[in-house]
């Protein structure tokens, strides 16, 4: 006697149109996916307001942006929220031009994952599969020691991970910590949390 298991993966998922299901996250095959997802609080808050300050000249605007601390752009916040553990979504293809923040978006997601794994006590490393150039860029944006600055006895770092790594190596916020110690501890955290592989390793 033989038994056959039929996978239901090929079946079209049921798309709920009744308003009583509005609290659910929409299915990715829902024809109104973009409208429904934009209505969720964590995504509606990441919309661009479209406001351009016409009172400032281009030079003044550039000066203001260069002197401000790093902030995730709305589209980067959207990506982070989309792939958080609060949603049912577990994959996303980021496709855009150069310099639009794809690497920083990926780092933000990876750091959320790393924090979650640490809370669970899981020591599994995050896998980054990319070409050598992309790996170098990822590592540089994750931690660039040239961006470490001492201000009033405290180290700060203006990058897409913000103060996250600094808080891990200095949870008690001690003043005047040795720079070399901070750099070595952050490098140790990254080496223990990330595994960088090229495409050839999968041949």
Please provide the spans of the model-predicted regions.
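SF2 helicase/translocase NTPase motor core
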Residues: 2-79, 87-93, 100-203
């Amino acid at each position: 006697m033989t038994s056959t298991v039929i996978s239901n993966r090929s079946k079209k998922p049921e798309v709920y149109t009744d308003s009583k299901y509005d609290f659910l996250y929409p299915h990715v095959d829902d024809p109104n996916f973009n409208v429904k997802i934009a209505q969720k609080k964590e995504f509606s808050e990441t919309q661009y307001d479209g406001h351009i300050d016409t009172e400032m000249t281009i030079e003044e605007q550039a000066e203001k942006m260069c002197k401000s601390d790093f902030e995730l752009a709305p589209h980067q916040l959207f990506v982070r929220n989309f792939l958080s553990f609060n949603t049912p979504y577990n994959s996303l293809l980021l496709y855009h031009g150069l310099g639009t923040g794809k690497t920083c978006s990926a780092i933000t997601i990876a750091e959320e994952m790393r924090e979650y794994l640490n809370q669970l006590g899981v020591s599994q490393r995050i896998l980054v599969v990319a070409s050598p150039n992309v790996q170098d860029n990822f590592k540089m944006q994750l931690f660039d020691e040239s961006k470490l600055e001492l201000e009033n006895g405290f180290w700060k770092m203006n990058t897409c991970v913000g103060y996250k790594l600094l808080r891990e190596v200095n949870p008690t916020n001690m003043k005047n910590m040795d720079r070399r110690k901070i750099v070595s501890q952050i490098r140790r955290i990254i080496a223990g949390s990330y595994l960088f592989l090229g495409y050839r390793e999968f041949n």
